[in-house]
């Protein structure tokens, strides 16, 4: 993750990002510190969102990271804050596949996705779903049976 995030941020200079399925907001915090840009951190679990908000405060990026509880993209904040230059999602392959078309509606043309939480044997299915949603494959970063994907709209 850090290597992929560093290279995408350096190459693309995103201005507005989303961490979907943020959990404890580790990626949102890392991105806010790295790029000094606004990051929306969203999770389906309200307890995770509370923990994330605490972590954001502890890391001194509460001026940059906003935490919300939402199922997928079902929250008005996405219309207010999006579309995004960069979306990070570290969630399971099944939900990633289901969200492919919504990802396309919420990322700017030319914007990037960094997707992880994908077992290497699930990579082809995830790529198929995102290609069908008009994303272009950039690269895969494999690690111990898991993959992180970089895709662009």
Where are these regions (language model features)?
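S-adenosylmethionine
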Residues: 44-153
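Conserved SAM/SAH cofactor-binding pocket of Class I
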Residues: 1-72
């Amino acid at each position: 993750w850090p290597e992929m995030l560093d290279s995408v941020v350096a190459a693309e200079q995103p201005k507005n990002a989303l961490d979907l399925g943020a959990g404890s907001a580790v990626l949102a915090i890392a991105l806010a510190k790295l790029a000094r840009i606004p990051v929306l951190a969203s999770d389906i679990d309200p307890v995770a969102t509370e923990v994330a908000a605490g972590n954001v405060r502890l890391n001194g990026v509460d001026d940059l990271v906003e935490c919300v509880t939402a199922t997928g993209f079902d929250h008005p904040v996405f219309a207010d804050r999006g579309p995004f230059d960069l979306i990070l999602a570290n969630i399971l392959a099944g939900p990633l596949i289901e969200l492919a078309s919504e990802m396309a509606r919420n990322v700017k043309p030319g914007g990037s996705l960094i997707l992880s939480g994908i077992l290497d044997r699930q990579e082809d299915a995830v790529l198929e779903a995102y290609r069908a949603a008009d994303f272009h494959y950039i690269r895969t970063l494999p690690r111990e049976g898991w993959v992180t994907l970089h895709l662009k709209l």
